[in-house]
A protein has these predicted regions:
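Catalytic domains of riboflavin
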Residues: 1-231
């Protein structure tokens, strides 16, 4: 338990300092490691590192109360609604994922001052500026969002469940919960870690080696779940 508390404390300190944290969800779920960093600290070199060392999709996970105020909805609901016009879209949303629940994807955005939106610089700007929207959500943030962003774009937004870990144990909820523990804006950039040798998700052992090499805290979902229960 002491080791878990130390690991959690290290992860919180790293996020506060604008450094990466690696988050493992659960071997019975996706069993994947995400490289994450608080949105308010994102710089272009962070996106470059996520792109090169993680290799998955760079997304922005945001707390539910913020996405609700912005009027954002889950992509699977948008697609299902399109099924009223074209029944094929209803088929696309049938069933659940192999790991058990629906994805947390919403729309993908670009900041209006970006060019293509996909470069490290552009994605970092979009994420950082979206963190400002989240910070100002009750003070002009909604208008700021509508005025300064466009969709579709290159930064997918992930909507966290309302009660976070009490509703869902995905990386979206785990990472937004981590921002709350760190007293940061509840918006966090996340990217799955891939293995170019096996062409699968990076194993926990390989992630531990990477974390040790670069001095990055690696935290497991069980530690966050235990903390949430104790709170």
């Amino acid at each position: 338990m002491a080791e878990s508390l130390l690991s959690l404390a290290e992860a919180i300190a790293a996020l506060k300092a604008g450094r990466f944290v690696l988050v493992h969800d659960d071997k019975t779920r996706e069993n994947e490691i995400d490289m994450v960093i608080a949105a308010e600290h994102v710089k272009p070199y962070h996106i470059a590192t996520m792109r090169k060392d993680a290799g998955g999709l760079v997304c922005l996970a945001i707390a539910n109360y913020i996405t609700s105020k912005l009027g954002l909805v889950y992509m699977h609901d948008i697609i299902a609604d399109m099924g009223k016009v074209n029944p094929i879209f209803l088929k696309l949303t049938e069933g659940r994922t192999t790991y058990g629940d629906k994805p947390s994807f919403s729309i993908a955005i670009n900041h209006r001052s970006t060019y293509t939106g996909v470069t490290d610089q552009d994605r970092a700007l979009t994420i950082y500026k979206m963190a400002e929207v989240c910070k100002n959500i009750d003070n002009g943030g909604v208008e700021q969002f509508a005025r300064n962003f466009r969709a579709p774009g290159h930064v997918p937004i992930l909507i966290a469940s309302k009660r976070l870990l009490h509703d869902r144990m995905g990386h979206t909820e785990l990472c937004v919960y981590l921002t709350q523990l760190a007293d940061l804006i509840p918006a966090i950039a996340i990217c799955e870690m891939m293995d170019s040798a096996t062409h699968k998700a990076l194993s926990v052992d390989a992630a531990q080696e990477y974390a040790s090499k670069f001095g990055i805290p690696l935290i497991d979902a069980s530690e966050l779940k235990a903390n949430a229960k104790a709170a």
